[in-house]
Amino acid sequence: MSTHINAKMGDYADTVLLPGDPLRAKYIAENFLENVKQVNSVRNAFGYTGEYKGHRISVQGSGMGIPSMSIYINELVREFGVKTIIRVGSCGGIAPDVHVRDVLLAQGSSTDSAVTVNTFGPGFHYAPLADFKLLDTAYHVAGKLGIETKVGDIFAADRFYNDELDMEKLRDYGILGTEMESAGLYLLAAKLHFRALSVLTVSDLIFGDEKATAEERERTFNDMINISLETAIAGK
């Protein structure tokens, strides 16, 4: 048991899928895993452990933004020995060739969050990156499933509502999409020495009107979930 997780040691698998939305965690557990056990309910940040094709997998809701997510990552890794974390979440599409429901694999994550500066000090701009083996596996798994993915840089915003941010410049520099977590995930992976990858579904477009409904975000991002689960068990 930790401060924000009321599970026991051994309740979590070595690999955890980490959606921000606790209801998405519940959806994954109920629709993709077998022999499911709920292992966390503190603050309604639901956590579950079950089996996927005979392999033990956990899923844990982490909330919105780097500060909330960092709490769960630190406790999962430090207190429960988790070795691999795959973020499954939504993002806003930025690049011209990105469309709603596209699946993005975050090779790296730029950010305007102070988390990297607070870690390394001013003047050093750390570049948070995914685990290459996980990234490569996810890309090839998606191909075998017939799911097209786009691989590249994701922008992890410190604020959801940010009128000062120059989205056109992000687009010009090839940023695929924006969310609020991946840079923190990759930074903590480097610090705590676990494997990490963000697999994201585009829920809306920054430069367009197309968007997925809240219900669709919760229940129909199955391509992202299938890629993540197959990546989690690859080679086991």
Curated annotation (Swiss-Prot):
UniProt keyword Ribonucleoprotein present: no
Reactions it catalyzes: a purine D-ribonucleoside + phosphate = a purine nucleobase + alpha-D-ribose 1-phosphate; a purine 2'-deoxy-D-ribonucleoside + phosphate = a purine nucleobase + 2-deoxy-alpha-D-ribose 1-phosphate
Active site: D204 (proton donor)
Any Gene Ontology biological process: purine nucleoside catabolic process
Family matches, as Pfam families: PNP_UDP_1 (PF01048)
Family statement drawn from the similarity comment of this UniProt entry: Belongs to the PNP/UDP phosphorylase family.
Protein name per UniProt: Purine nucleoside phosphorylase DeoD-type
EC annotation from Swiss-Prot or TrEMBL: 2.4.2.1
Keywords: Glycosyltransferase, Transferase
Record's keyword annotation contains Methyltransferase: no
